[in-house]
Every structure is written in structure tokens, then in C-alpha cells.
Amino acid sequence: MVENGLNIKEAAKTIAEIKASGSRKTVKGEGIVLLKNWSAGTTNSENPKPKFSGFVANGDEVSFQVWNNLPAYIFLEKEKHVAGETVVRIKYELSRYGMVINKMEPVDGYNPDDFIDYRYDIKVEGDEFSHALKESGATPKAISTISSLLCFKENNDINKRFCREFAALSHHDNCRTGLLAHTTKCLKIYNGIKGAYNFLLDERTNDLMVISLAIHDIGKIYEMHNGTYQEYSFVTHRGLGMEYLVEHRDVIESNYDKEFFYMIYSVIQQHHDEYGEGARTLYALLVHMIDNMDATFSSIDEMIQAEKYTTDEAGTKIKFNDKYLNIFKAEQSVQE
């Protein structure tokens, strides 16, 4: 627990009590938060009103409002800070309208890791990743290519970020080591389904699938830092991943050839299929489907874990809206 960290559950409870009472009172407080993102918005009268979000202790995320005539706004607009890296002390007011930040200033003595959710053991996930590669039937040449692309031997910044970064901002595996865990699960899914379906895979195309799955989300190490979008995130992790691949194309072409490089390039570009550049190869489509399968199953599993259901409860207290793959508790109606 972060000393002097903001207790968002208590803050939310206070806001709810103020709303329920119909009171106009405000409650002041302060706390420590890891700066995440902020974006400018406006009130009904067109006055600037940025929206700010940050991580509090235990990985919870919280959103605030910041008025343009307050010191907190000046800090966000003028001072140097790094999203996902800068820890700040905030002074705020709670009212029936929510939480408003009055003042914000950087504070020393805190580590961003103190605010980030840990669900995975990085060593365990690293071992699982290596095991999944061995089980894939990929050639030693493919394993060597992956090792070079992910800089396993050098253990440099690229490798560290791949092993530590989040897989998503707010969906599945949005936690420390989530990217590595998601990638490993995708490899495991592939290992399972390729025994049931032919897909006309041979040694070369199996290598193609394994390498593609291993690096399909590599762009996320540039898109995010500590689960927070960075300056060029608007390019998307697919665009940043393609850029990374071009920088390392010699690794692939020296082991395979130019066509092989572009086949992997197409997977990174198209693995979101209808949500991006549509899949134009079988391999891009397969990676897209495997990626979606893990995202869906991981979201279900995380919801069950968060609710702390027993085995029997998990089987009976969850309902699904298949059209949107949304998860609902049994005691809630879809309308809610």
C-alpha cells in the first residue's frame, strides 16, 4: 500500500453520500497518485475543463476534473511530466459533482511500480513463454529469430519492456507483465488448435505463425509506458510495430527471405482485421482470431477472479450478451 495514497473507494463513497443527502457541501482531501493521462475538454459555457486520470495504490484507476483557473491546470499544461512515470500529490474537493483537483505537484520518494497492478510473476511468465515456443514445433531458426527480435540475449530495454508492459489500457491483461502473459496465451492457444485443424501449415508457415504470434503486439512497448499511452500512441501499436519490424528486417531476411518478412509485416498490420486494415492473408486472420479468443477468455477469467466466485457460483452467476460479448452478473439486468 502506498503511504498517503489516495483511497478512491472512500472518495467514491463520500461523493455518493453527498449526492444522496442532496447537500451542496464539499469535502477536501489530498493523496498521492501516479499521473496517467489527461485531455482537454470544455464546460457547457465553453470554458476549458481538462479531464485527468491516474493510477492509485493497488492499480485502481481514477478520473478527475481540473478547472482552468486552478494551479493543477497550470501544472498539467506547463510543467514537464511523463505519463506513467510522474508521481504527484493532489489536493482535491469532493462534491455532488464528483472530484475536482485544485492543486497538483510532483513528489519524490515513490516508485511507479507502487501504483501498478501485479497479477503475474514475471519469471513464471517468462518460463511459460519459453515452454510455449518449444511446444509450437517451430524450428531452431525460428526460435533464434524470435530471440533476436525480442533481444532475449541482450536483456536490454526492448526485452525488459516486452516482459513488463501492459497488454491493454483498460481491457484484458491491463497490468504489469500483461503483454508477455497475453503473448504466451496466444501461443498456447495456437499450439492447441493446430493439432485439431490442418490449415495447410508446413514447417515454413508454422515458423511464420509462431514468430508472428510472438511479436504481433511488439508495438505496445512504444504505444504505452506503465500502461499509459505515450506521445505517439495515435499511430497505434500496429503502426509502431511495423516500424519496429522494418528496423529489424535484416534479422528476418537473413534467416528466411523478403517474402517471409512481408508476410510477418502483414500480420502486424492486419491482425485486428475489421478493426483496422482487413486481414489479407490466412496468417493475419488466424492471429486475429487467436488474439480475440485470448482477449475474450481473459476478460471472463479476470471478471470471475475479481468477484471471487466459488466454482459453483462462477457457473451460475454469470450471464452473457453474445452479440457484444459483454459480461453481466446474474443479479443485474441487461438494461442496467
Regions picked out by a protein language model, each given a short descriptive name:
Residues 43-70:
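OB-fold (S1/OB) nucleic-acid-binding surfaces
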Residues 26-29, 68-91:
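Short nucleic-acid-contacting surface segments enriched for D/E, G, S/T with interspersed K/R
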Residues 198-199, 204-307:
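Divalent metal-dependent catalytic cores for phosphoryl transfer on phosphate-bearing substrates
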Residues 33, 186, 291:
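Divalent metal-coordination and catalytic microenvironments
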Residues 91-122:
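OB-fold/S1-family single-stranded nucleic acid-binding modules
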Residues 112-230:
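Acidic/His-rich, divalent-metal-binding segments that scaffold phosphate/diphosphate chemistry
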Residues 1-32:
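OB-fold nucleic-acid-binding modules
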Residues 25-46:
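Structural detector for short beta-strands of small beta-barrel domains
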